[in-house]
């Protein structure tokens, strides 16, 4: 049975139940299959996502930006200086 995760936020894997984790894995498998077959999917169409990382990592930031773009969204990176966290 599908769990409604609309509006749910999580920062750690511990924030998800086992059932929610399985649902995330199932969705990721489906999206990966669609990517490889060239099937269009825009799960994040019309969405803007803010990315905040505690440590600078170009590879991680680029990976997230590419993933968000592939899903039809817009990613915005905010560094520590942008958010006045220092």
Predicted regions and their residues:
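Positively charged, low-complexity intrinsically disordered leader regions
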Residues: 1-62, 66
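Short beta-strand elements in bilobed, periplasmic/extracellular small-molecule ligand-binding domains
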Residues: 72-86
